[in-house]
């Protein structure tokens, strides 16, 4: 799980050897990404697979962006091809976004979040999803994060204030590999973007307490 190791230096005091090991693991993960990238810039879930993973593609981009911010070198063609694919898939119609599958708006919101994190927000896509008024808490958080990253904190706050943010226990091992804990960890990031540090700290403490007894997936650790 290389993603959590990108930020490990900021979270813990590590020995020189531990830092070197973490950096090595991140660099090797970056090198392996080519095995997963398809010709159109998307990423598959398994090396050599001809099919792309919707969530996995956004996750790969998220990893590359955070790694670059942390000082790791990301091959320009790798991330540029990813961006071109994300951009091509980011402007969907309201009809498609209103599909009943819970994972569809969530995956779409994550794509918009990563584009905003990359510094190239898709305003049309964000506004389309905003109009859908999804009741999915995680989708709202990701969209709020996209607006916050793009300088529209007022819109981000309005999304979070639409109703109570409920986190029912769940685990998804197919569509977006998530859980209620992963979703709450993502909310911590959004709250920090909105400078709601006390709320973020309170939620983070709850997550940490739960981590003492539960097994965490890669997604949960990374978020």
Tell what function each PLM region has:
Residues 1-223:
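Large, well-folded core regions of big proteins
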């Amino acid at each position: 799980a290389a993603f959590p190791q990108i930020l490990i230096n900021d979270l813990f005091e590590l020995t020189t050897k531990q830092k070197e090991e973490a950096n090595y693991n991140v660099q090797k993960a970056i090198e392996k990404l080519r095995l997963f990238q398809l010709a159109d810039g998307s990423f598959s879930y398994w090396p050599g697979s001809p099919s792309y993973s919707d969530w996995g593609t956004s996750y790969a981009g998220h990893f590359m962006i955070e790694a670059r911010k942390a000082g790791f070198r990301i091959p320009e063609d790798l991330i540029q091809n990813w961006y071109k694919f994300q951009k091509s898939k980011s402007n969907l119609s309201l009809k498609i976004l209103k599909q009943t599958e819970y994972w569809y708006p969530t995956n779409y919101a994550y794509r918009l979040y990563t584009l905003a994190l990359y510094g190239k927000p898709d305003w049309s896509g964000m506004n389309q999803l905003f109009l859908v008024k999804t009741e999915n808490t995680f989708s709202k958080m990701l969209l709020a994060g996209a607006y916050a990253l793009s300088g529209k904190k007022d819109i981000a706050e309005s999304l979070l204030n639409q109703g109570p943010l409920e986190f029912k226990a769940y685990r998804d091992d197919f569509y977006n590999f998530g859980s209620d804990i992963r979703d709450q960890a993502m909310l911590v990031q959004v709250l920090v973007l909105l400078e709601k540090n006390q709320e973020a700290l309170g939620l983070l403490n709850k997550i940490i307490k739960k981590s003492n007894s539960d097994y965490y997936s890669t997604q949960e650790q990374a978020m």
